[in-house]
């Protein structure tokens, strides 16, 4: 037994609900889930409407939120650690408004934290907003399919080419509507639910600037929060280093 195994066993069993982001499905969490289960935790990975095997892309943010709320309540989950990655951050913000009494802690992993009245696309510089919206306009069903070279350089910048291609091949076009909707988050900002922010330093999906970026720009909106930092990019680290990510999640989630 190495020191990391001892470290894991010092932490009580937790119930994790892992909410994936755009262009992926629950398989994004596969390696991390395996590591968390090995540590003795309980893990749930709901699939968001309009993602993965769900071919109906005509969804909005409310539909997605309702599905996660239904998943948690129908499975009678309580005292959960609710984790959102990327777009999943906006989902857990809205879920927390309805289920704050079931949530022990919110964890945002390089996740969007929106101000009241903002959309996800509002978090990007104007040039990037136009790029994404033009892709949606060019599609037949208001979805966004990222070009491979953009995905390779921005989303999986630390991966080798073979890994980048494997991850890209598993992506599906992203419904655009939930990304452009401006969300009412007044209730979220009245909550006192403990929260954490995990920041991977090489994640470049949202350019870091005076008025943009994961950390400190979006993370600071959480008020008082636990900050956990690691090394990794937006999508390949979950696949290549799942044990590392599981440990960061445990650090972010512990009492």
Model-derived segments and their meaning:
Residues 17-21, 85, 199-200:
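The conserved beta1-alpha1 loop
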Residues 97, 103, 107-139, 178-179, ...:
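Flexible "cap/lid" loop of the alpha/beta hydrolase fold
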Residues 83-88, 92:
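Gly/Ala-rich beta-loop-alpha elbow adjacent to hydrolase catalytic centers
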Residues 11-53:
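Conserved HGGG/HGGXW glycine-rich cap/lid loop of the alpha/beta-hydrolase fold
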């Amino acid at each position: 037994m190495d020191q990391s195994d001892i470290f894991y066993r010092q932490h009580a069993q937790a119930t994790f609900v892992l909410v994936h982001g755009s262009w992926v499905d629950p398989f994004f969490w596969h390696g991390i889930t395996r590591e968390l289960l090995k540590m003795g935790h309980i893990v749930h990975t709901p699939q968001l409407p309009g993602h993965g095997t769900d071919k109906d892309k005509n969804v909005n943010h409310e539909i997605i939120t309702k599905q996660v709320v239904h998943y948690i309540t129908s499975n009678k989950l309580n005292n959960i650690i609710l984790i959102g990655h990327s777009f999943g951050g906006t989902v857990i913000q809205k879920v927390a408004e309805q289920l704050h009494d079931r949530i022990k802690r919110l964890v945002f992993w390089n996740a969007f934290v929106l101000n009241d009245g903002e959309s996800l696309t509002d978090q990007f510089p104007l040039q990037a907003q136009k790029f994404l919206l033009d892709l949606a306009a060019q599609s037949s069903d208001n979805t966004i399919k990222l070009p491979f070279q953009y995905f390779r350089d921005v989303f999986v910048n630390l991966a080798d080419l073979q890994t980048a291609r494997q991850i890209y091949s598993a992506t599906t076009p992203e419904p655009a509507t939930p990304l452009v909707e401006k969300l009412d988050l007044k209730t979220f900002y009245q909550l006192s639910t403990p929260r954490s922010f995990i920041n991977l330093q090489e994640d470049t999906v949202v350019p870091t600037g005076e008025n943009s970026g994961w950390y400190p720009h979006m993370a600071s909106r959480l008020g008082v929060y636990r900050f956990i930092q690691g090394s990794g990019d937006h999508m390949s680290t979950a696949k290549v280093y799942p044990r590392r990510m599981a440990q960061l999640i445990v650090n972010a989630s512990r009492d």
